[in-house]
Amino acid sequence: MTIKRKKVSVIGAGFTGATTAFLLAQKELADVVLVDIPQLENPTKGKALDMLEASPVQGFDANIIGTSDYADTADSDVVVITAGIARKPGMSRDDLVATNSKIMKSITRDIAKHSPNAIIVVLTNPVDAMTYSVFKEAGFPKERVIGQSGVLDTARFRTFIAQELNLSVKDITGFVLGGHGDDMVPLVRYSYAGGIPLETLIPKERLEAIVERTRKGGGEIVGLLGNGSAYYAPAASLVEMTEAILKDQRRVLPAIAYLEGEYGYSDLYLGVPVILGGNGIEKIIELELLADEKEALDRSVESVRNVMKVLV
């Protein structure tokens, strides 16, 4: 009996896509297909070959190919979308909507054609709106179209808390809700260091500064790079989500999910805690929010809906 190997296709062979592909292969989670536009087919093949040639050194067994032909992605278990125009310094996420939504629709049609049973994970910004666009175009069940932002935003939040307390990031837990933008909602009340509430360890003004830095985390890196945006942490976040799906781990992770009444919102994709497993989003977890937390989430939802108004 032949055992079918897992297959993940990564759409977009830029910094984030290529890093994601390499991390997936390193962890031996699946065979990887790295896809980009025909004009970039040779560089995409070159990156894939370069990764493959690292396998004897890194000690992993996974096949990696580069292509511009979506037929090569057929029967993927998971498809990760990182393609889209890059965010530039001073550029708002809203500016990305019109162009990237057109790109999403084109990509999604190819995914649906060749991998109708896949789970799609979207990274392209503005990710809440782009995930909604992919969902509408694909016609897949809502649990199989997921956006990635909460894992990344929470990772940034945890990093800054660990730095503040001079503790291991492994001992920091937390959640960031809402849209992936300046109105995201880091939930201090649900965040802990070794099980101890942060509010007992960090002064209020320092916590407020950490929350604000988390909200501006992506922009901080964009400004420092001068060209392009973050890719190591986004790629690592995509891999964590993909692993939870492929291994049916049923991880509790923040992810962008389609809401139908949860938290009082409907017909939009928003970052919320979910159980992530082999079927995609197995369950949306509704946290009890205080009045000020709900007001902050309302503002975040308003920002997401404003971006969605310009979807094409």
Curated annotation (Swiss-Prot):
Keyword set includes Phosphoprotein: yes
PTM annotation (Phosphoserine): residues: S149
Top-level taxon in the UniProt lineage: Bacteria
Active site per UniProt: H180 (proton acceptor)
InterPro entries assigned: L-lactate/malate_DH, Lactate/malate_DH_C, Lactate/malate_DH_N, Lactate_DH/Glyco_Ohase_4_C, Malate_DH_type3, NAD(P)-bd_dom_sf
Phosphoprotein found in the keyword field: yes
Catalytic activity annotation: (S)-malate + NAD(+) = oxaloacetate + NADH + H(+)
Family membership noted in the UniProt record: Belongs to the LDH/MDH superfamily. MDH type 3 family.
Stated role: Catalyzes the reversible oxidation of malate to oxaloacetate.
Protein name per UniProt: Malate dehydrogenase
Organism: Bacillus anthracis
